Amino acid sequence: PMGRGSFGGNMLIASTWHHREEMRRIGRGNADRRWDVRPQHPALSYDLAHNRLFATAAVLQAPVLDDKDAAAAQYGAFGALVGHELTNAVSGRGHYVDGNGNLGDWWTPGTASAWATRTGPLSARYSGFAYPADPARKVDGARTLEKNIADVSGVELAWAAYQKAEPKASKADRERFFRAWSGVWRQQLSPAAASE
């Protein structure tokens, strides 16, 4: 049995168990219920093919979702991440898979045209941003468009939900919401990474 004694021993036990479980699944046809991410890996993901949202145990705890944090921080971090992932269901990629997981463009030509009209300015706006690690380089707004849409939409959805839940939130709590969101994706890029 696993215990606190040996990390290597615990990894071997877990790996053996995982292999045994994989062998049992062969031929059972339950692949649609699988998600190949370990619970200890912080991940929140929308499965486009099966129209479902997954959250691992690791993402359901601090720093993303901390029950000791104020509601503003929970909405700003976890709520915005959920909104980000759900946006993928109806975004530029999501319109090629319907609610039953069938491939096909379910948008009308008018919807597709309106989407392009509404997302064009967002692409242009992001193209004007420079990388902090390499100010001479600009973001490729067309290349990052899907993620930018999901980020902006996720924050808007979480903000609307927070305002509905806490209509009289203080200025400090409103700021806490946005600080929590900015903390979710914080990272420092080297000039080499920024140029990739």
Model-based region annotation:
Residues 1-196:
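Intrinsically disordered, low-complexity linker/terminal regions across diverse proteins
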